[in-house]
């Protein structure tokens, strides 16, 4: 077979014209050491702080230390297969996680990968894990409540949408229980919840997920889990991932609630990473920027204005403000709130709910110390009826705690002091509440109304909770219209007050408790 030179040249020309050569210009370097999930890389010149780096075996890392002749990175996931001399490439991207309604009802890891065995998430959008918080101009003051369903919190330490309220206390004193009850109480309230579990046992996280499923709360909840068995990098990133998922709803005019359980473990993970990266240690061996670690996270929780939402959605959503409410949890050691991380987070947040082991062990649960718990902005968001009725409760409790301390030393007490102590005992009993049984607004209002108007004063302390429960059942069956009015208006009119007085008197006469 004879080949025609002109045909060959034509063929070569057509091949050259049809060639699609894609130039992939990427910076690359070499691994010079791998220890404890920390990699040192030589030869990378153009790297951003927090940029994703690509390692062999489809593994990614995060650039954290940018030095003159090397880059310190932390590996996300397994690192056993990475060795000295491996090639590392830059990606030009900051770490992103999937966001959107597809995540609701799912359990994911810190990178947004599903870990609940229900198949892929199929989220249409991703967003950067680190974002700048909305500016002062775009924020609105807190004015709508987040009902926790817990008597002691809703009456004395109210939380508003867009607030940051710290839950602080020693281990095993009910911090997670308060957070889970708050999530359970959001059923039907149009509030998306995100629960971020950091450094907990996998079995504990599983128990929480199971409880949320049983109560039907998983339908509106995203669980982000970075268990104790996962790397320090994953525990460090989990809160930022959860926050980005929550911001998706905030920026589109919806309301979201995020719980970080707990930020002490995140600070420990960050300390571990920083020490391995040879950053200079400071107080309690934490790095110098541990305050910034938490402030940049918690400042992203905010109530944003209608203009912000309209601008963000390019006019698709109009006249709706969005909010992200944060409930960070901090674990103290032997009640020491003056340690480094607790003082940092107390100064960042808009108030704290302080849980005490002594109260917990005495059977007062939730174990909230009303004297030192405070909500700096939530009062503006409290429902009218609760605001009207709760003032007396806080005063009664504060006076009771003070008098109880003196009463230990005094043998004979005057009548007024004795009455105050008796009322305090009954109010303390009234504020006890079993786990997973959050209350509606009308139920809370009726309980506070009974205490304020002296209907509990002539009861034995042990009869207070049965009386409260019986009264609720009685009102449900005999005064459904009154309940509906209180629940709908979130207020107590003069007529409703009179009707409630009459109903409680009738119930007390019946003695059905």
From Swiss-Prot:
A GO term from the CC aspect: plasma membrane
Species this protein is from: Burkholderia thailandensis (strain ATCC 700388 / DSM 13276 / CCUG 48851 / CIP 106301 / E264)
InterPro entries for this protein: ATP_synth_asu-like_sf, ATP_synth_asu_C, ATP_synth_asu_C_sf, ATP_synth_F1_a_nt-bd_dom, ATP_synth_F1_asu, ATPase_a/bsu_AS, ATPase_F1/V1/A1_a/bsu_N, ATPase_F1/V1/A1_a/bsu_N_sf
EC number: 7.1.2.2
Subcellular location: Cell inner membrane
Highest taxon of source: Bacteria
Gene that specifies this protein: atpA1
Disulfide bridges in this chain: none
Biological role: Produces ATP from ADP in the presence of a proton gradient across the membrane. The alpha chain is a regulatory subunit.
PROSITE patterns (UniProt xref): ATPASE_ALPHA_BETA
Name of protein: ATP synthase subunit alpha 1
The protein's enzyme class: translocase
One protein family per Pfam: ATP-synt_ab_N
């Amino acid at each position: 077979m004879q080949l025609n030179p002109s045909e060959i040249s034509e063929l070569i020309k057509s091949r050259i014209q049809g060639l699609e050569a894609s130039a992939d210009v990427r910076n690359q370097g070499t691994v010079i050491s791998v220890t404890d999930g920390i990699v040192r890389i030589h030869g990378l010149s153009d790297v951003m702080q927090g940029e994703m780096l690509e390692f062999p075996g489809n593994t990614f890392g995060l650039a954290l230390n940018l030095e003159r002749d090397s880059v310190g990175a932390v590996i996300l996931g397994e690192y056993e297969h990475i060795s000295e001399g491996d090639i590392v490439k830059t990606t030009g991207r900051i770490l992103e996680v999937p966001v959107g309604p597809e995540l609701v009802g799912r359990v994911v890891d810190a990178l947004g990968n599903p870990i609940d065995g229900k198949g892929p998430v199929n989220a249409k959008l991703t967003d950067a894990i680190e974002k700048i918080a909305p500016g002062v101009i775009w924020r609105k003051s807190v004015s709508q409540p987040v009902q926790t369903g817990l008597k002691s919190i809703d009456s004395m330490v109210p939380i508003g949408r867009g607030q940051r309220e710290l839950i602080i206390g020693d281990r095993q004193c009910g911090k997670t229980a308060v957070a889970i009850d708050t999530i359970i109480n959001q059923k039907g309230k149009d509030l998306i919840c995100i629960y971020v579990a950091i450094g907990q046992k996998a079995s504990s996280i599983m128990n929480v997920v199971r409880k949320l499923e049983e109560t039907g709360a998983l339908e509106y909840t995203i669980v982000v889990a970075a268990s104790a068995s996962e790397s320090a990098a994953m525990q460090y990133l989990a809160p930022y991932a959860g926050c980005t998922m929550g911001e998706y709803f905030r920026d589109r005019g919806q309301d979201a609630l995020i719980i970080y359980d707990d930020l002490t473990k995140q600070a420990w993970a960050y300390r571990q990473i920083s020490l391995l990266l040879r950053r200079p240690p400071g107080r309690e061996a934490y790095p110098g920027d541990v305050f910034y670690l938490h402030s940049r996270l918690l400042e992203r929780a905010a109530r944003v204005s209608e203009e912000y939402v309209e601008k963000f959605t390019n006019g698709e959503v109009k006249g709706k403000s969005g909010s992200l409410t944060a409930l960070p949890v901090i674990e103290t050691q032997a009640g020491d709130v003056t340690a480094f991380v607790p003082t940092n987070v107390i100064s960042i947040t808009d108030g704290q709910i302080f849980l005490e082991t002594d109260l917990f062990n005495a059977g007062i649960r939730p174990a909230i110390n009303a004297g030192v718990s405070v909500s700096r902005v939530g009062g503006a968001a409290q429902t009218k009826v609760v605001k009207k009725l709760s003032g007396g409760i806080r005063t009664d409790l504060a006076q009771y705690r003070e008098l109880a301390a003196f009463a230990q030393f005094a043998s004979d007490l005057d009548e007024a002091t004795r009455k105050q102590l008796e009322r305090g005992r009954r109010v303390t009993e009234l504020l006890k509440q079993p786990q997973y049984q959050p209350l509606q607004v009308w139920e809370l209002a009726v309980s506070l109304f009974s205490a304020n108007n002296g209907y509990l004063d002539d009861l034995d302390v042990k009869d207070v909770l049965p009386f409260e429960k019986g009264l609720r059942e009685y009102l449900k069956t005999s005064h459904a219209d009154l309940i509906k009015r209180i629940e709908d208006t979130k207020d107590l009119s003069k007529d409703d007050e009179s009707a409630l007085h009459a109903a409680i008197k009738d119930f007390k006469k019946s003695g059905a408790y």
